[in-house]
Amino acid sequence: METTGEVVKTTTGSDGGVTVVRSNAPSDFHMAPRSETSNTPPNSVAPPPPPPPQNSFTPSAAMDGFSSGPIKKRRGRPRKYGHDGAAVTLSPNPISSAAPTTSHVIDFSTTSEKRGKMKPATPTPSSFIRPKYQVENLGEWSPSSAAANFTPHIITVNAGEDVTKRIISFSQQGSLAICVLCANGVVSSVTLRQPDSSGGTLTYEGRFEILSLSGTFMPSDSDGTRSRTGGMSVSLASPDGRVVGGGVAGLLVAATPIQVVVGTFLGGTNQQEQTPKPHNHNFMSSPLMPTSSNVADHRTIRPMTSSLPISTWTPSFPSDSRHKHSHDFNITLT
Protein backbone atom coordinates (compact mmCIF):
# COMPACT_ATOMS: atom_id res chain seq x y z
CA MET A 1 0.00 0.00 0.00
CA GLU A 2 1.39 3.25 -1.10
CA THR A 3 0.34 6.85 -0.49
CA THR A 4 1.39 10.12 -1.94
CA GLY A 5 4.61 11.43 -0.46
CA GLU A 6 4.90 8.62 2.03
CA VAL A 7 6.28 5.14 1.90
CA VAL A 8 4.59 2.56 4.04
CA LYS A 9 6.01 -0.89 4.44
CA THR A 10 3.90 -3.65 5.85
CA THR A 11 5.43 -6.77 7.25
CA THR A 12 3.35 -9.75 8.32
CA GLY A 13 4.84 -12.12 10.85
CA SER A 14 4.09 -15.73 11.68
CA ASP A 15 2.03 -14.73 14.70
CA GLY A 16 -0.22 -12.51 12.59
CA GLY A 17 1.15 -9.18 13.83
CA VAL A 18 1.56 -6.23 11.49
CA THR A 19 4.34 -3.70 11.74
CA VAL A 20 3.93 -0.41 9.93
CA VAL A 21 6.99 1.70 9.29
CA ARG A 22 6.74 5.13 7.78
CA SER A 23 9.74 6.54 6.08
CA ASN A 24 9.24 10.04 7.36
CA ALA A 25 8.46 9.07 10.99
CA PRO A 26 10.74 10.52 13.67
CA SER A 27 13.45 8.31 15.00
CA ASP A 28 11.90 8.33 18.45
CA PHE A 29 8.86 6.52 17.14
CA HIS A 30 10.75 3.74 15.34
CA MET A 31 10.15 0.31 16.75
CA ALA A 32 12.60 -2.49 16.45
CA PRO A 33 11.31 -5.44 14.43
CA ARG A 34 10.47 -8.53 16.37
CA SER A 35 12.76 -11.39 15.83
CA GLU A 36 10.88 -14.34 14.34
CA THR A 37 13.62 -16.79 15.23
CA SER A 38 13.34 -16.16 18.98
CA ASN A 39 13.07 -19.36 21.00
CA THR A 40 11.81 -17.61 24.14
CA PRO A 41 8.56 -19.09 25.35
CA PRO A 42 5.65 -16.67 25.43
CA ASN A 43 5.03 -17.04 29.16
CA SER A 44 8.62 -16.30 30.27
CA VAL A 45 9.45 -13.18 32.30
CA ALA A 46 12.12 -10.82 31.14
CA PRO A 47 15.14 -10.54 33.41
CA PRO A 48 15.17 -7.48 35.64
CA PRO A 49 17.34 -4.60 34.56
CA PRO A 50 20.74 -4.35 36.21
CA PRO A 51 20.79 -2.16 39.34
CA PRO A 52 22.33 1.28 38.99
CA PRO A 53 25.89 1.63 40.25
CA GLN A 54 26.04 2.73 43.91
CA ASN A 55 28.59 4.94 45.57
CA SER A 56 30.67 3.06 48.11
CA PHE A 57 30.61 5.96 50.63
CA THR A 58 30.78 5.08 54.32
CA PRO A 59 31.26 7.33 57.45
CA SER A 60 34.51 5.54 58.24
CA ALA A 61 35.87 6.32 54.78
CA ALA A 62 34.85 9.93 55.21
CA MET A 63 36.61 10.12 58.55
CA ASP A 64 39.72 8.60 56.97
CA GLY A 65 39.63 11.24 54.28
CA PHE A 66 39.38 14.07 56.78
CA SER A 67 41.96 12.62 59.17
CA SER A 68 44.78 13.73 56.93
CA GLY A 69 43.85 17.40 57.28
CA PRO A 70 43.13 19.56 60.36
CA ILE A 71 39.71 18.95 61.95
CA LYS A 72 37.63 22.07 62.45
CA LYS A 73 35.59 21.91 65.63
CA ARG A 74 32.02 22.97 65.08
CA ARG A 75 29.71 24.46 67.62
CA GLY A 76 26.34 23.05 68.57
CA ARG A 77 24.90 19.54 68.72
CA PRO A 78 26.50 16.96 66.36
CA ARG A 79 24.51 15.77 63.37
CA LYS A 80 22.27 12.74 63.81
CA TYR A 81 22.13 11.84 60.11
CA GLY A 82 24.73 12.12 57.39
CA HIS A 83 24.42 13.65 53.93
CA ASP A 84 23.09 10.35 52.49
CA GLY A 85 20.45 10.00 55.21
CA ALA A 86 22.23 7.21 57.07
CA ALA A 87 22.57 7.44 60.86
CA VAL A 88 25.95 8.71 61.99
CA THR A 89 27.69 6.55 64.59
CA LEU A 90 29.10 8.74 67.36
CA SER A 91 32.40 7.97 68.97
CA PRO A 92 32.14 6.79 72.61
CA ASN A 93 35.02 9.07 73.54
CA PRO A 94 34.11 12.62 74.65
CA ILE A 95 34.85 15.56 72.42
CA SER A 96 37.41 16.86 74.89
CA SER A 97 39.54 13.75 74.35
CA ALA A 98 39.61 14.15 70.55
CA ALA A 99 42.31 16.80 70.62
CA PRO A 100 45.06 16.54 73.22
CA THR A 101 45.23 19.53 75.54
CA THR A 102 48.30 20.99 77.13
CA SER A 103 48.59 20.02 80.80
CA HIS A 104 49.46 22.76 83.29
CA VAL A 105 50.28 20.33 86.13
CA ILE A 106 53.92 20.20 87.10
CA ASP A 107 55.18 16.64 87.43
CA PHE A 108 57.70 16.56 90.26
CA SER A 109 58.53 12.89 89.66
CA THR A 110 60.42 13.66 86.43
CA THR A 111 64.04 14.67 86.16
CA SER A 112 65.32 17.98 87.40
CA GLU A 113 65.59 19.34 83.83
CA LYS A 114 61.82 18.98 83.31
CA ARG A 115 60.73 20.30 86.66
CA GLY A 116 58.96 23.65 86.83
CA LYS A 117 61.02 26.49 88.13
CA MET A 118 59.55 27.96 91.32
CA LYS A 119 60.18 31.65 91.88
CA PRO A 120 61.50 32.28 95.42
CA ALA A 121 59.37 34.39 97.72
CA THR A 122 60.29 38.04 97.82
CA PRO A 123 61.55 39.01 101.28
CA THR A 124 59.40 41.57 103.07
CA PRO A 125 61.19 44.84 103.75
CA SER A 126 61.93 45.54 107.37
CA SER A 127 59.93 48.77 107.18
CA PHE A 128 56.70 46.78 106.66
CA ILE A 129 57.26 44.34 109.52
CA ARG A 130 55.13 45.32 112.49
CA PRO A 131 56.84 45.02 115.83
CA LYS A 132 55.38 42.51 118.26
CA TYR A 133 54.56 44.00 121.62
CA GLN A 134 54.81 41.89 124.72
CA VAL A 135 52.04 42.20 127.27
CA GLU A 136 53.24 42.95 130.75
CA ASN A 137 52.76 40.09 133.18
CA LEU A 138 50.27 41.25 135.79
CA GLY A 139 50.43 38.10 137.87
CA GLU A 140 48.35 34.98 138.04
CA TRP A 141 44.58 35.20 137.89
CA SER A 142 42.80 33.53 140.74
CA PRO A 143 39.68 31.46 140.02
CA SER A 144 37.61 33.93 142.08
CA SER A 145 38.39 37.06 140.08
CA ALA A 146 36.19 40.13 140.01
CA ALA A 147 35.11 39.62 136.40
CA ALA A 148 33.98 36.05 137.03
CA ASN A 149 32.00 36.84 140.19
CA PHE A 150 30.27 40.08 139.20
CA THR A 151 26.54 39.67 139.88
CA PRO A 152 23.93 42.40 139.22
CA HIS A 153 21.11 43.09 141.69
CA ILE A 154 18.09 45.42 141.78
CA ILE A 155 17.23 47.04 145.12
CA THR A 156 13.77 48.56 145.54
CA VAL A 157 13.58 51.48 148.00
CA ASN A 158 10.08 52.40 149.19
CA ALA A 159 8.86 55.96 149.56
CA GLY A 160 10.13 57.61 152.77
CA GLU A 161 13.18 55.31 153.17
CA ASP A 162 16.81 56.38 153.03
CA VAL A 163 18.48 55.15 149.85
CA THR A 164 21.98 55.22 151.34
CA LYS A 165 20.97 53.22 154.40
CA ARG A 166 19.18 50.66 152.24
CA ILE A 167 22.26 50.11 150.09
CA ILE A 168 24.59 49.80 153.09
CA SER A 169 22.29 47.27 154.77
CA PHE A 170 22.29 45.21 151.58
CA SER A 171 26.09 45.24 151.44
CA GLN A 172 26.36 43.97 155.01
CA GLN A 173 24.65 40.68 154.13
CA GLY A 174 27.95 39.25 152.92
CA SER A 175 31.63 40.00 152.47
CA LEU A 176 31.26 41.18 148.89
CA ALA A 177 31.95 44.64 147.58
CA ILE A 178 29.09 46.77 146.26
CA CYS A 179 29.19 48.87 143.10
CA VAL A 180 26.24 51.22 142.49
CA LEU A 181 25.55 51.46 138.76
CA CYS A 182 22.40 53.56 138.31
CA ALA A 183 19.01 54.45 139.82
CA ASN A 184 15.70 55.98 138.77
CA GLY A 185 13.02 57.70 140.78
CA VAL A 186 12.26 60.89 142.70
CA VAL A 187 13.76 61.97 146.05
CA SER A 188 12.34 64.50 148.48
CA SER A 189 15.45 65.38 150.51
CA VAL A 190 19.18 65.09 149.92
CA THR A 191 22.25 66.26 151.82
CA LEU A 192 25.29 67.03 149.67
CA ARG A 193 28.86 67.86 150.59
CA GLN A 194 30.02 71.35 149.68
CA PRO A 195 32.73 71.40 147.03
CA ASP A 196 34.63 74.25 148.65
CA SER A 197 37.30 73.86 151.34
CA SER A 198 34.99 74.74 154.23
CA GLY A 199 33.71 71.15 154.44
CA GLY A 200 30.07 72.12 155.08
CA THR A 201 26.97 70.40 153.72
CA LEU A 202 23.88 71.56 151.84
CA THR A 203 20.44 70.03 152.30
CA TYR A 204 17.93 70.32 149.46
CA GLU A 205 14.24 69.62 150.06
CA GLY A 206 11.61 69.32 147.37
CA ARG A 207 11.06 66.94 144.44
CA PHE A 208 14.18 66.03 142.54
CA GLU A 209 14.45 63.43 139.81
CA ILE A 210 17.54 61.22 139.90
CA LEU A 211 19.70 61.66 136.82
CA SER A 212 22.61 59.47 137.92
CA LEU A 213 23.68 57.62 141.05
CA SER A 214 27.06 55.89 141.35
CA GLY A 215 29.37 54.77 144.10
CA THR A 216 31.28 51.92 145.69
CA PHE A 217 31.30 50.31 149.14
CA MET A 218 34.31 48.10 149.85
CA PRO A 219 34.73 45.84 152.89
CA SER A 220 37.68 46.70 155.11
CA ASP A 221 39.31 45.06 158.12
CA SER A 222 41.15 47.31 160.57
CA ASP A 223 42.47 45.85 163.86
CA GLY A 224 40.00 42.97 163.69
CA THR A 225 37.03 45.27 163.08
CA ARG A 226 35.26 44.83 159.79
CA SER A 227 33.54 47.85 158.29
CA ARG A 228 32.52 49.39 155.01
CA THR A 229 34.27 52.26 153.29
CA GLY A 230 33.20 54.22 150.27
CA GLY A 231 30.52 56.66 149.22
CA MET A 232 28.14 57.76 146.50
CA SER A 233 27.68 60.73 144.20
CA VAL A 234 24.35 61.83 142.79
CA SER A 235 23.02 64.22 140.15
CA LEU A 236 19.48 65.59 140.56
CA ALA A 237 17.17 67.72 138.42
CA SER A 238 14.73 70.16 140.04
CA PRO A 239 11.25 70.88 138.61
CA ASP A 240 12.40 74.27 137.28
CA GLY A 241 15.20 72.63 135.23
CA ARG A 242 18.16 73.30 137.51
CA VAL A 243 20.68 70.51 138.08
CA VAL A 244 22.40 69.97 141.42
CA GLY A 245 24.78 67.25 142.44
CA GLY A 246 27.75 66.20 144.50
CA GLY A 247 28.83 63.65 147.05
CA VAL A 248 26.08 62.28 149.30
CA ALA A 249 26.91 63.35 152.87
CA GLY A 250 23.69 62.43 154.66
CA LEU A 251 20.15 61.37 153.98
CA LEU A 252 18.81 60.59 150.53
CA VAL A 253 15.08 60.20 151.18
CA ALA A 254 12.93 58.65 148.46
CA ALA A 255 9.71 60.44 147.48
CA THR A 256 8.54 57.60 145.20
CA PRO A 257 9.65 53.96 144.93
CA ILE A 258 13.22 53.97 143.61
CA GLN A 259 15.00 51.13 141.83
CA VAL A 260 18.76 50.96 142.33
CA VAL A 261 20.95 48.68 140.18
CA VAL A 262 24.04 47.43 142.04
CA GLY A 263 26.67 44.80 141.36
CA THR A 264 28.42 42.57 143.89
CA PHE A 265 31.94 41.26 143.38
CA LEU A 266 34.89 39.99 145.37
CA GLY A 267 37.12 42.70 146.75
CA GLY A 268 40.85 42.67 146.09
CA THR A 269 41.88 42.82 149.78
CA ASN A 270 42.45 39.09 150.19
CA GLN A 271 44.41 38.87 146.98
CA GLN A 272 46.65 41.80 147.90
CA GLU A 273 47.52 40.30 151.29
CA GLN A 274 49.14 37.30 149.64
CA THR A 275 52.87 37.53 149.06
CA PRO A 276 53.42 38.33 145.39
CA LYS A 277 55.38 35.72 143.51
CA PRO A 278 58.50 36.86 141.67
CA HIS A 279 58.02 37.15 137.92
CA ASN A 280 60.56 37.60 135.20
CA HIS A 281 60.00 40.78 133.20
CA ASN A 282 61.80 41.27 129.91
CA PHE A 283 61.13 44.98 129.62
CA MET A 284 63.68 47.76 129.33
CA SER A 285 64.57 49.30 132.63
CA SER A 286 63.95 53.01 133.05
CA PRO A 287 65.77 55.27 135.52
CA LEU A 288 63.94 55.48 138.83
CA MET A 289 63.06 58.78 140.36
CA PRO A 290 64.69 59.44 143.72
CA THR A 291 62.30 58.88 146.59
CA SER A 292 62.53 60.07 150.14
CA SER A 293 62.87 57.72 153.08
CA ASN A 294 59.49 58.61 154.51
CA VAL A 295 57.60 57.16 151.52
CA ALA A 296 55.84 53.93 152.45
CA ASP A 297 56.66 50.67 150.72
CA HIS A 298 54.43 49.95 147.73
CA ARG A 299 53.65 46.50 149.15
CA THR A 300 52.13 47.94 152.30
CA ILE A 301 48.35 47.50 152.36
CA ARG A 302 46.36 50.40 153.69
CA PRO A 303 42.63 50.23 154.32
CA MET A 304 40.53 52.62 152.29
CA THR A 305 39.20 55.29 154.63
CA SER A 306 38.45 58.10 152.23
CA SER A 307 35.23 58.38 150.33
CA LEU A 308 34.79 59.10 146.66
CA PRO A 309 36.44 62.23 145.26
CA ILE A 310 34.41 65.36 145.63
CA SER A 311 32.50 66.30 142.51
CA THR A 312 33.03 69.59 140.74
CA TRP A 313 29.36 70.54 140.91
CA THR A 314 28.84 74.11 142.02
CA PRO A 315 25.91 74.84 144.32
CA SER A 316 23.01 76.74 142.88
CA PHE A 317 23.06 79.24 145.79
CA PRO A 318 26.05 81.47 146.54
CA SER A 319 27.74 80.80 149.85
CA ASP A 320 28.23 83.57 152.34
CA SER A 321 31.87 84.59 152.67
CA ARG A 322 31.32 85.51 156.34
CA HIS A 323 31.12 81.79 157.26
CA LYS A 324 34.70 80.69 157.49
CA HIS A 325 34.07 77.53 159.50
CA SER A 326 32.21 74.31 158.82
CA HIS A 327 28.46 74.93 158.87
CA ASP A 328 25.40 73.07 157.58
CA PHE A 329 22.68 74.72 155.54
CA ASN A 330 19.12 73.57 155.13
CA ILE A 331 17.62 74.86 151.87
CA THR A 332 14.08 74.18 150.78
CA LEU A 333 13.17 74.43 147.10
CA THR A 334 9.54 74.95 146.16
Swiss-Prot record:
DNA-binding residue intervals: 72-84
Listed Basic residues bias regions: 71-80
Bias type Pro residues, positions: 44-54
Ranges of compositional bias, category Polar residues: 90-103, 306-319
Compartments it resides in: Nucleus
Membrane-spanning segments: none
Keywords, in A-Z order: DNA-binding, Nucleus, Transcription, Transcription regulation
Residue stretches making up the PPC domain: 147-287
Origin: domain of life: Eukaryota
Protein name per UniProt: AT-hook motif nuclear-localized protein 2
Species this protein is from: Arabidopsis thaliana
Lineage of the species this protein comes from: Eukaryota, Viridiplantae, Streptophyta, Embryophyta, Tracheophyta
